[in-house]
Structure formats: structure tokens, C-alpha cells
Amino acid sequence: EVPSRGLGDVYKRQLITPSGKKYDTLKEEDIVFVSNDGNHDTNLKPSSEWRFHKDIYLKKPDAKAIVHAHSPHATAVSAHGKDIPAFHYMIALAGGDSIKCAKYATFGTQELSDNIIDALEDRKACLMSNHGQVAFGENLESAFELAEELENICHQYINTIKLGDPKILSSSEMDVILEKVKNYKKG
């Protein structure tokens, strides 16, 4: 239906924040319209991470908005390059029984994008080794809420492991929780 309205293939281009600009100074006109090959129509350069945004949109039909952040706790946990196990049931909000950590690759590369796509299998959020986090949702608000929740989970995980090895919820318990969170915040 979208192409018939003359809008073309919406997954061939995206709106993304510019590279190197402080978020608290962004204006509407600073947002960069970028095509899937990285071409853009302004003097501002798109974020170097446009590639993995594009690939998430292409591979995850339910991704309508993406939040990528170098939030302090997620970045700290990501520096260990390990998945976060089900130490808390809220892990399920990301869509699985753990928070996956994408393997490290240099920022802005196809390799990083591929690693993120692998880590997002059956999930809506992941850590990016030695980098930060990425989360997506059906709109910007839900993507941002999930990114905030992932940051909270990482903070809790840091505090938990200070006390030793946490008790990990079983796969069967996480299956029950995953079923329950399908309708979380849906009224």
C-alpha cells in the first residue's frame, strides 16, 4: 500500500541523529534523512551507526523505532562481552531468557551490524560488546522505555554480582514469564 501512495519503499531510507552533535542541542532540522547505502541529503553526517539501524529495520519487521545508547551501566556490563543471565524476571522484556551481548566489532562496520542482528535473534534489545546497548520498539516511546529498562537491569546486575553469583531463574520459569510479558503494559 505504501508504494501505491507514491512513498516508495520506506525501508530504503531512515531518519537518524547526526554524528557528533549533542542530543540536548538537537533541533528538528538536524535530523538526517539517510538512504540504505549511506547517502544523505544534508551537510550533517548521519550517525556512524546508520548501518545497524538499517539492518534492524530490514530484519525485524516489528522494529519501528530504535534507540542506541552508551548508557553507563549497559556500557560497563558490555565491556565484559558476556550475556546477562536471567537473574531477574524483567530480562524477559527484551524478548528472551537472557540479554545477549553482540560480539565486538569496530563501530560503523557491517561486521558490527551483523553481530547485533545475531544477538537480537528473538529479542528486542541487546548489549554491544565494549560499546553500549541497542533496543527497538513499535514506536519511539516503547524503544526508549526498553532502553531505559535495559540500563536499569544492567545497574541491578552490577550490584547483584558484587554479592557473588546470583541465583538464575530456570528456563521453565522464564518460559512462563515470557508468556506473561507478551501483554505487559497493554492495558
Predicted features and spans:
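A structural-propensity feature for long, helix-poor, extended segments
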Residues: 95-129
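A conserved C-terminal secondary-structure "cap"
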Residues: 115, 122-187
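Short acidic/glycine-rich loop or secondary-structure boundary segments that cap or lie
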Residues: 24-25, 74-78, 110-111, 136-137
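An anion-binding catalytic pocket shared by soluble metabolic enzymes
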Residues: 9-67, 74, 83
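Structural motif
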Residues: 13-14, 64-67, 74, 98-100, ...
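Divalent metal-coordination and catalytic microenvironments
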Residues: 5, 56, 70, 116, ...
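Class I SAM-dependent methyltransferase SAM-binding "motif I" and its flanking Rossmann-like core
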Residues: 72-107
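Single conserved hydrophobic/aromatic residue that forms the stacking wall/gate
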Residues: 1-11
